[in-house]
Amino acid sequence: MRKHFLLSFVMMAFAFISCSANNTGSEGSSPVSDKKADNKMTQVKLETTLGDIIVELYNETPQHRDNFIKLVKEGYYDGVLFHRVIKDFMIQTGDGNSKTAGPETMLGDGDPGYTIEAEFVYPKYFHKRGALAAARTGDQVNPERRSSGSQFYIVTGKIYSSEELNMMAKRMTDIKKQDIFRRLVTENRAKIEELQRNQDNAGIQALQNELIQITEAEAAKTPSSMTDEQIDAYTSVGGTPHLDGQYTVFGEVIKGMDVVDKIQNTQTGAADRPTTDIKIIKASILN
């Protein structure tokens, strides 16, 4: 990263070092399930009021896979609404409270009472059109990016040009470096406060330069440039590349994207909830 990019962020981070970070992330752990003995991927049918959607669950995300299978077998998803629908972005469901929700009820907080550890298999699995991913709370209250125990979304997204993807990759790199630097500042909080108390400007400058160098080196280990597969998908079928590496992608739609499109094109009202309820009538394991 060029030094001038970080300067304003660096000075702000040092100036507000005395402010406490909010790290009250979601607690709880997911239920333990048996792992599949073979490499065959589980398929799940979602019978909705607008048609059937069939998804396939990735074996490389075993906690999410096993939890999804568990909830399907328990009937947790039977009757839940697609409570958040944004055209050219995604359709979201899995809020257990939505089964009996009235038309004015605000939804999005319902879950089984636990979260799931993030399972990022990136860049192999990314937010292409049709991707199945776990919803979660934001980074400020969930720095570990743990997934909701039940809520998930299916990506619809949009098609991007190569130029747009290049610009997005640069922004993602900048955000990553800011996150790294913020963590380093927190880790060096005591040292920074001591330098500030002693009014050691030279020491502060030296530490700032050191943290910038560490940030550069750490960010370089995981470049934000997209793979050929990502570029091909995002420039042909589309998706939501800005979510990559931030939310767990644990499966994909293998049949029924026409139904997904029907859902994403429905009229919505407050909080992006469809004005006419669209629900999962029944979820079932196919194999």
Q: For the regions a protein language model found, what residue spans apply to each?
A:
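Cyclophilin-like peptidyl-prolyl cis-trans isomerases
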Residues: 7, 19-287
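Positively charged n-region of N-terminal signal peptides that target proteins for export
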Residues: 1-4
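Sec-dependent N-terminal signal peptides
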Residues: 6-12
